[in-house]
Amino acid sequence: MQSYQEEYIANVKEIAALTAHKSPGGRSFEEYLEELLANRREAEQKTNRNMELLREGLQPTLEHLFEADAQELASLREFASGLLAGTNEVDGGLFCQVHQALLSLARLNRDRNQMIQELYWLGIGRNNLCNKMVGLETTEAEKYTHKMRLCFTEAAAYLKYYDEIEDTQTRGYILRSRANISLGHFRSPGEKIRLTRQTLEILQDRSYQEKEPGLPWERFIYMTHQQMASSISRSKTEVMAPEDIASLMDSVYIVYERRIRESAKQSQKPPFRSAFSYASINYYCGLDTLDGLLSKMELLMDETDIHDFSPDNMYGLISIPAFYCQYLQEYPERLPQKKEYVESLYQKILDYLRLFPDASGNESLFFYLRQLSCTFVETGDGISYGEFLQKLLILFAPDIYVHSYMVGKASCAFCRIILFEEPSYFDDIDHIRAVEDPRQKQAAVLDYAMQCGLFHDVGNLNFISLYTQISRQWFAEEYEMSKLHTVAGNMSLSQRPSTRLYAEAAHGHHSWYDGSRGYPGSYRRLECPQRQMVDIIGITDFLDSITSMGQLHFGEKKTYAEAVREAILLEGRRFSPLLTARLREKEVAEALRKAFEEGRREAYYHLYEQEASS
């Protein structure tokens, strides 16, 4: 690996550490704040340095890739392997860019073996992106799933030329690609099961095995059985066909029996994942009742340890509860008797997350948390969904929490100014119009503004690595993917009573006032009763975002005065003229600036309190 590549990876890891939540360690708030701000200044410097490294080191290499010698190409591949290794993500987007460039080179050189290898690795990188789509509708995620699957499908198509290809490694990539076609989300579980079944037939074909005895066939077959075992559809609306259940049963039992043997040798219990799959398939085959399955899941979850950060314990402590709550969502009549247990589950998970060491880049952890967030069940007495989301932001994305808090405070200041001039400005919003007393109405508006600010960016939790680890300007594909945070936020907030009121703020804060641009297309301003508040969240989000470190993902940071001028220039197009007219007044712009500053300090104090009490 070249020196600039090593420095880039080291900087990404250091930036993640600098911006992660910190323990006060007995220091005063002022000392704590001073360190946080110093860390963010250092992180900004390292981000600028990384962009310089890519500009001066990687970009010239990629532009002259056809002239690169074998050593340079090997260095690039080693660099890529350091960007994404298994579930440890340093920079998945750059991983894809490097392998896309290497694939283009292989195509031009007509190097079939190298082309198959690059298709495989590009597919792995794209699958990493697809894993961030948990909870989104299939229509939203399909574009990314399709790109991922195309890579594996093209590589797997060379199975037709298996006899011609003599390289053992290349044959292995073809077979692994064939298995990976079944990765990602499908519209029905039957599609995934059918593809996996076909892969098993190929891997178990003696003719292929005899032609390449050097490949680890047993391992390939076992891993494909694992993939099949993970295809269980835990939904009462998606009924699996009998032949699919039969295939699942075979794979689940094969995996479970092997795990039992391996665990027995080490005097351990079977892994949580295998035990859960075994219990699930027994339920789907009619060998157990739903109550029986829930009881077995409870036994597994009770065995987890909040001090064990192994992949299997993490699965048992976060992912199994996600499926447990999914059953309770689909069968709500079971919730009353499980209420106290669910509340204790969420508390145990939060205790575990507070203790979790060095979570940055742990894609498995964030994948399981996305699952848990999608199936979260509010009991009425335990932690609300809104509180749970705020705790996740504080623990894993403190900068997003600080930004959201600042947007909330500035929105309150803007609302206060508007209410002084037009007390009925927000009366299109049902719960605001219902309040008659002027003081109570103002309090309701300000509380609503604050909560909308706090929750407007929760969809970023789906794409957390983009915000907490990417230390460079985003690639076009990453920017497009980040737009889905509005859809993800709207979906998650709208499905729970405690957050339903704030869903439109998450949905529409990047839309344009005149509808000419912005996103998502599903937000239609004139059809939204909360549009006045969404307008305010949109403009305050803009004013803070382009003046913060996060702006480095798009270009250069602006000063606050420049941000105000830019917002005014977008009057009537991106922003409501009713808001920009007030922003022209120096007193209003200054009041918002002070609110941002106060909000930043208050948000950091909340971080300080949370860490001091944990």
Descriptions of predicted regions:
Residues Q473-W474, Q551-E562:
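Short, charged, surface-exposed loops that flank catalytic or proteolytic processing sites
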Residues Y405-R416, M481-S494, T559-S576:
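An active-site-proximal "capping" alpha-helix that borders the catalytic cofactor pocket
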Residues H99-L103, N127, C151-Y162, Y256, ...:
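A short, hydrophobic secondary-structure junction motif
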Residues Q2-M406, A410, S613-S614:
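Non-catalytic interface/linker regions that flank or bridge core catalytic/transmembrane domains
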Residues H403, H456, H485, H509-H510:
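Histidine-centered active-site/metal-ligand motif
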Residues E166-Q169, G214, I429-G453, L493-I539, ...:
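Histidine/acidic-rich helix-loop-helix segments that form or flank divalent-metal centers
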Residues S344, K348-E480, Y523:
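Acidic/His-rich, divalent-metal-binding segments that scaffold phosphate/diphosphate chemistry
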Residues G125-G135, L203-Y208, M228-R234, K409-D430, ...:
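Short regulatory "switch" loops immediately downstream of catalytic or recognition motifs
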